[in-house]
Amino acid sequence: MSFYNPYLVKRTFLKKAAPSRPTKEYTRIIPKCFKTPGAAGVVPHTSTLDPVCFVGDKETPILYGDGSRSLWSAGGRGGPGTGAGQGHTPVALTFHVYDIIETVYGQDRCDHVPFQFQTDIIPSGTVLKLLGRTSDDRSVCVNVFRQELYFYVRVPEGLKLDFLIQQCSRENFNFSQGRYRYEKTSKRVLREYCVEAREVYRVFASSQGFVDLLAGGLTAAGCEVFETNVDAARRFIIDNGFSTFGWYSCAAAVPRQGGAARDSWTELEYDCAAGDLEFHAGRADWPGYNVLSFDIECLGENGFPNASRDEDMILQISCVIWKAGSGEAPRSVLLNLGTCEEIEGVEVYQCPSELDLLYLFFTMIRDADVEFVTGYNISNFDFPYVIDRATQVYNLNLKEFTRVRSSSIFEVHKPKNSSAGFMRAVSKVKVAGVVPIDMYQVCRDKLSLSNYKLDTVAGECVGAKKEDVSYKEIPHLFRQGPGGRARLGLYCVKDSALVLDLLRYFMTHVEISEIAKIAKIPTRRVLTDGQQIRVFSCLLDVAGREGYILPVDRHADAEGYQGATVIDPSPGFYNTPVLVVDFASLYPTIIQAHNLCYSTMIPGDRLCLHPHLGPGDYETFELASGPVHFVKKHKAVSLLATLLNVWLAKRKAIRRELATVSDEAVRTILDKQQLAIKVTCNAVYGFTGVASGILPCLKIAETVTFQGRRMLENSKRYIEGVTPEGLADILGRRVECAPDASFKVIYGDTDSLFIHCRGYRPEQVTGFCDELAAHMTRTLFVDPIKLEAEKTFKCLILLTKKRYIGMMTTDRLLMKGVDLVRKTACRFVQETTKAILDLVMGDEAVRAAAERLCAMRVEEVCARGPPVGFLKVVDILNDSYRKLRLNRVPVGQLSFSTELSRPISYYKTLTLPHLVVYHKIMQRNEELPQIHDRIAYVFVQSPKGKLRSEMAEDPAYAAQHNIPPAVDLYFDKVIHGAANILQCLFENDSDKAARVLYNFADLPPDDL
């Protein structure tokens, strides 16, 4: 493909139409290679030509009319230019909602809204914008009026609320911009056990800003305020029994007229009152929401791209768009800077400058009805980069490119402490009307891999690979011309397609929507805003129904408490079965079983205030911080337990339904629903235990962990007292076992016990484990606490807390806290260590030898030698040494790599191995690595006395010149890799293990 670049030739291609808006001057940055093939650098160009692109060879304007429509606008519509219908005649409307945005209208908007709602915004009023799609799949924004926003206040005796508010109005100039009213009511405060409600005022305010103003003034006057942190969207959902995601109908939706009245860039826009809406909870299907997966390719002239440098342009943005839930193939689009050859299956839009490319991308987000946006590390790189280029280089106002006009936001909020570095600190993408899903963060949470590069994750999950293009090739391919850009474009599109495949693999969009529904929060907040807001919204709901109001915590109680502890492990190698039992949902069931809650708690020194309570009315827990009491269910119901009961009953019903459903789409939604409930249940304990949280109560959290420890200890005592005869009584049958058969707990980890079943065979343990766990549940605990048999190991290497390796009865190897594939180890060491582990876990003779070694002192092993079976391990070590000595290990298997994280001049020490290699490459006048490149190196044979770093060499150079490796150094890594997993055989000391392994390795005398 080719086109005339309008900024490099004196020619006008588009017919001049009558101007619909004032002429605007644009400054563009043009790559020099557009005029001189292969040239680096850029040139600025200023003109009044509007943004354009080329589709094929046809020049196409990007913006239409007054700029509120673009080439992506469906049917020529786009926002403020058109209306949803004629007149203000109400119509019936059915629509699905995926996002809720809160905004404030002032009286200056009266001409834009139907007459019946004008008084609601004088002098100002809250409007909720419900974004979604209609039943015929058209994008829609429904502006909801008359949703009341309120908080509660308790006024000290002797003071009048009227007087306090008037005083507040005199002290604040902005007071006239809002309106308020109040009513007297009675409520209980959700802080501790309380029998009688107390008099409070419910204060209604026209906006959240006005709530803050009133609350600030009343607090300063000595009043106590409640629920000032509850926004209008949350009131809308909770007070009306609505949802943040799902189907609604409206009997009287008034079409919003076109022109300046339009307040969104959806195809349709309506106004209605909150009371006109009805939510359809039983309908679970989705409309055709669009999911956009995008990726950018940048030019990094001096290493890693820097968005503030003019030369570091965005070269391409690939956009793969999928209609969620449909079987249609996704639409692949490439926004390309410069000319580009055709790419099969891809729509190529050629842009004469980066500014045109940015306009094309941002108008796509605004006008192409995109509801979900995904990518890989878009929170930390892609979105910040395009935003910085647009705002810092071109001074674009990105608020003009979201789905709404009022309360528009298009930003990335970076964490305050982002010193963790690239791809480590997590930022929040905030684009009004768009749900961002960063699949890098999702994959980090769901997977356990040696690295989380897209190529690695895609290979693991969907069996696909990236296109083979090194980012070092990007500048060359771009300047090569249309053919090079096409190759780069295919690479870019493939990345976006892989990310979309990952999203569909995990069904993340469905999962977060189900969590949003359960937690009563907007979908866009699920991935970024943590667990606290989920539980808070639900607690607010159930508390309101029971006549409670929630205090606004000031975080004065910041003392810590003893968290979950473990039963210390007994390290060693266990060659007889180890049964692992765990408590199903331990912390939630403790809350349920013991009626724990703010509403049932009585601090130890306040029991005297409740003389009507007898000893049988409450349960006492002697905590490290002092006693605390919780009243029993017949006196007061735990609101937290009520939440958990409802959620778990719903999850049970969903799982029953799941077993009978065959439709895959329905199965996916049901599965994500039950998963959402599980995740939210597990967040309840954490909600109370975070001192800086929304409503912390460390006494509750401490009680939960205290009871959890007590349950583990009781279980340990009970199981260790079960004899073969006792087991026969429990099972109602005798189990053939060794005379000295016994059960011993060798490790306890928060909610699980590792039970060494000495004298029993693995298949026997598998046969009776469920019955044993059920018996312990009935004997020791109250409903709904339940102990379950989780798994059985045939043999187990137990190292330390949270570090073990076990061979399950299915012959699958399970590792916890032990990573054989690490960035700090080369492939040769990893593979040798894995071979030793497989031998120890899989060979009966070696297993028996390992068990005997555990019972021997290190001195005894050195004096008498290891058991014969263990010599097979020594053979592997000796074989690895011979391979190193004879230079038979490929250089690639001996290579390490370290990232060049900053310019070479910024390093304080240059003796790091990868920096030594950097300087060697520089001395040889070879191409230098760039910032954020991983520099590979091997350690090669050198004269004795040299520093280890000086032994570092470029792997390619070492292979080319057949330089032998540093044998002793690599063998030492092999020894310590093996010692790391075998330390439990040698008094659980890795240094002693390494000494023993060296002692029996067959090394030449000069190497000992």
UniProtKB/Swiss-Prot annotation:
Entry keyword set: DNA replication, DNA-binding, DNA-directed DNA polymerase, Host nucleus, Nucleotidyltransferase, Transferase, Viral DNA replication
EC number(s) per entry: 2.7.7.7
GO biological process, one term: viral DNA genome replication
Record-level GO cellular component terms: host cell nucleus
Enzyme class: transferase
Domain of life: Viruses
Entry keyword Transferase: yes
Alphabetized GO MF terms: DNA binding; DNA-directed DNA polymerase activity; nucleotide binding
Keyword Nucleotidyltransferase assigned: yes
Gene3D superfamilies: DNA polymerase family B, C-terminal domain (1.10.132.60), DNA Polymerase, chain B, domain 1 (3.30.342.10), Helix hairpin bin (1.10.287.690), Palm domain of DNA polymerase (3.90.1600.10), Ribonuclease H-like superfamily/Ribonuclease H (3.30.420.10)
Subcellular location per the Swiss-Prot or TrEMBL entry: Host nucleus
InterPro entries per the UniProt record, alphabetical: DNA-dir_DNA_pol_B, DNA-dir_DNA_pol_B_CS, DNA-dir_DNA_pol_B_exonuc, DNA-dir_DNA_pol_B_multi_dom, DNA/RNA_pol_sf, DNA_pol_B_thumb, DNA_pol_palm_dom_sf, DNA_pol_type-B
UniProt catalytic activity: DNA(n) + a 2'-deoxyribonucleoside 5'-triphosphate = DNA(n+1) + diphosphate
PROSITE patterns registered for this protein in UniProt: DNA_POLYMERASE_B (PS00116)
Protein family: Belongs to the DNA polymerase type-B family.
PANTHER family: DNA POLYMERASE CATALYTIC SUBUNIT, DNA POLYMERASE DELTA CATALYTIC SUBUNIT
Protein known as: DNA polymerase catalytic subunit
Record lineage: Viruses, Duplodnaviria, Heunggongvirae, Peploviricota, Herviviricetes
GN (gene name): 9
